[in-house]
Regions:
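N-proximal low-complexity "stem/linker" segments adjacent to membrane-targeting elements
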Residues: 1-23
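C-terminal catalytic/acceptor-binding lobe
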Residues: 20, 160-236
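Short, acidic, metal-binding catalytic loop of nucleotide-sugar glycosyltransferases
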Residues: 23-33
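A conserved acidic beta->alpha catalytic loop
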Residues: 38-49
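Glycine-rich, basic loop-to-helix element that forms the pyrophosphate-binding segment
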Residues: 65-81
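Short aromatic/hydrophobic "clamp" motif used to bind/position activated sugar donors
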Residues: 87
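Conserved donor-nucleotide/metal-binding helix-loop-beta segment in metal-dependent transferases, i.e.
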Residues: 99-120
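Short beta-strand-to-loop element that shapes/binds the nucleotide-sugar donor at the catalytic cleft/hinge
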Residues: 116-134
């Protein structure tokens, strides 16, 4: 049975990390994807992923026409080709560590139409050093025996809310609702603003979605994914 999910991965020439990301996904979430879209920010050949992901029904392997085009333009290009109601967004440097994150995330999005996306990182990973607290609220919520936590509301200069390009399930309809991720940036900073600043894109869209009454959720404190690309950052 189809879950109506397309996985979109942004990749930037780190094929060893991409392979590890996909192997761990296939281990913990087989038979959950209708399609895998990988948008590569350069000329690399990613056809090897078809052997890593045998349960995926369809592959769409894109290569940016310009090397180092930037994450946001590539995301919007990939999203324009999504045909399913849900997107599991991911980057090329994560390791999934536990099962059922797709099913649990999907359940939360189905139950709560105002939930924008579901975080999978540990609560410790989402720590704000400047405030000595996590982005995740302390109160545990339970729905149908599934525990979840809400991400703190966005406050200017305080972070929180949680819209992110980190791994997480979200709806294609919510992306279209705001006219794409670049639209809030253009409204605030002008159409010619440098859209390669991923953190600014996340913050601006966080504020924008919160004004629409949406919130983000997180699964259990120990998390179900870990970042493996800390020392392999690609500058924009």
């Amino acid at each position: 049975m189809s879950l109506g999910i397309t996985m979109v991965i942004t990749s930037c020439g780190r094929q060893d990390l991409l392979a590890e990301t996909l192997r761990s996904f296939e281990q913990h979430a087989p038979n959950t994807l209708d399609e895998l879209i990988i948008v590569e920010d350069g000329p690399a050949d990613n056809s090897f992923v078809k052997d890593i992901m045998p349960t995926v029904k369809s592959f769409n392997l894109l290569n940016s026409p310009v090397t180092r085009r930037g994450q946001l333009l590539n995301i919007e290009w990939a999203y324009s080709q999504v045909k399913t109601p849900y997107i599991f967004h991911c980057e090329d440097d994560w390791r999934f560590t536990a099962p059922n994150f797709i099913e649990d995330s999907l359940h939360l999005l189905e139950v709560f139409p105002e939930c924008l996306m579901v975080h999978l990182r540990s609560h410790k990973d989402q720590w704000q050093e400047s405030h000595n607290r996590s982005w995740v609220e302390e109160e545990e919520h339970v729905i149908d025996a599934l525990s979840y936590w809400k991400i703190r509301p966005w406050i200017q200069h305080d972070g929180g809310f949680g819209f992110t390009f980190n791994p997480g399930l979200r709806r294609l309809a919510d992306y279209h609702r705001v006219g794409g991720l670049r639209t809030p940036i253009a409204v605030r900073y002008g159409p010619m603003f440098n859209v390669k600043d991923g953190c600014l894109v996340e913050r601006t869209n966080a504020e924008n979605y919160q004004r629409l009454g949406m919130w983000c959720a997180s699964l259990e404190p120990q998390g179900r994914v870990e970042h493996i690309g800390w020392h392999r950052h690609i500058p924009t």
